[in-house]
Amino acid sequence: MMAVPSRCSLGVAPLVAMVGGGQLARMTHQAAIALGQTLRVLATAADEPAAQVTPDVVIGSHTDLEDLRRVALGADALTFDHEHVPTELLDKLVAEGINVAPSPQALVHAQDKLVMRRRLAALGAAMPRFMALDSVDDLAEIDAFAQRLTGSKDAPMVVKAVRGGYDGRGVQMVRDSAHAREVASGYLVDGMPVLVEERVELRRELSALVARSPFGQGAAWPVVETVQRDGICVLVVAPALALADDLASAAQQLALRLAAELGVVGVFAVELFETADGALLVNELAMRPHNSGHWTMDGARTSQFEQHLRAVLDYPLGETDAVAPVTVMVNVLGAPQPPTLSVVTMDERLHHLFARMPDARVHLYDKVERPGRKVGHINFRGTDKDRKNPTKLRERAELAAHWLSHGQWTDGWDPHRAGDDVVEISLACGGRNDAQRQR
């Protein structure tokens, strides 16, 4: 199959094809509009977040070669909302002349944790100690691994499926060797190889987000702190506070070096552990816009979504400086129970949020709310005072996210109660009275 000439080569505005119709594709579409570009998405259904807003949609599967060909037809670049596309299919597209960015040779390092670990080891990147298991016959090796870690079979460890895990799926914390064998065997009997890793003593988790173009230009955003609960990122503080300049620079340089060594094109996230003794260890890699970069939509000169488009089209990359002393991003997750009837719709909750916190920058994905599902995020920009002590800014962000998820203010605030309309002051708006914005 011969590649169809790209739109750029015909003097037409660029077309980027993206595999996946989720929120990352939706927000990339928003960035494409501003740049005068077109984003075509491969979605599994018409009600996926990107498919609802993008006029150019292909309904199909990321595991079907013909569907991949359809979405890539005439595109200047084919890129990804997720990393689950089989690389053997991408190899065929590359052979047909399609510009796949990042390439399958790079993408496999974000798909396969064992491939990633072995390559990073060869590149000298620091990471948790690990061992690989391919068969239930190898389970006895876990005891010896635990002994090497701590001198005891009681060492706590982490068991990971080699492929397919995200947002905490496919990752389990285990108490000791016996627990590790039990968890690992569950994956192995299903034919999924596993990694067993040491559980390091953490100070916190960080993310170094960079972008790289085919020309080799790189750009790095400030290193951020990510807060995880139940394996899901719930909050990001940008930049990471109380992070020494030399450590922040080391994280950025590591991410840029890995992007170059792996041949990444596009946005590239390196998830890091900052250990209790001040070391940086690589945890995971992502080769696409990343949850830890959502703050850039309101807190940086160039958002990760615009930058991703620039990178895959080999445009000069944008500036990555922060535009506020600190930005807090908080994810809106579906609540365990539906909100009360008085605020049953997201639009009603959004109205009340803006009445109380007009400085909230809300990004909703138009997804059906389910427990724990990411349905949006909110960015709050802070001041120099907030950067010195971000507690109040973080509390406001979590308060706002809980309200959008649950329809309840955890501090007891009630917009319908007499008197409340005139007493609530937005903490981040110079003391202006929010009653001016109440209906």
Curated annotation (Swiss-Prot):
It catalyses: 5-amino-1-(5-phospho-beta-D-ribosyl)imidazole + hydrogencarbonate + ATP = 5-carboxyamino-1-(5-phospho-D-ribosyl)imidazole + ADP + phosphate + 2 H(+). The keyword Ligase applies. Residues 117-313 form the ATP-grasp domain. One of its GO terms (cellular component) is cytosol. Pathway: Purine metabolism; IMP biosynthesis via de novo pathway; 5-amino-1-(5-phospho-D-ribosyl)imidazole-4-carboxylate from 5-amino-1-(5-phospho-D-ribosyl)imidazole (N5-CAIR route): step 1/2. It holds the Pfam family ATP-grasp. InterPro entries: ATP-grasp (IPR011761), ATP-grasp_carboxylate-amine (IPR003135), ATP_grasp_subdomain_1 (IPR013815), PreATP-grasp_dom_sf (IPR016185), PurK (IPR005875), PurK_C (IPR040686), PurT/PurK_preATP-grasp (IPR054350), Rudment_hybrid_motif (IPR011054). Its EC number is 6.3.4.18. Keywords: ATP-binding, Ligase, Nucleotide-binding, Purine biosynthesis. ATP binds at K113, K160, E197, E198, R199, V200, E205, N283, E284. GO terms for molecular function: 5-(carboxyamino)imidazole ribonucleotide synthase activity; ATP binding; metal ion binding; phosphoribosylaminoimidazole carboxylase activity. NCBIfam families: PRK06019.1-5 (NF004679), PRK06019.1-6 (NF004680), purK (TIGR01161). Belongs to the PurK/PurT family. Homodimer. Catalyzes the ATP-dependent conversion of 5-aminoimidazole ribonucleotide (AIR) and HCO(3)(-) to N5-carboxyaminoimidazole ribonucleotide (N5-CAIR). This is N5-carboxyaminoimidazole ribonucleotide synthase. The gene is purK.
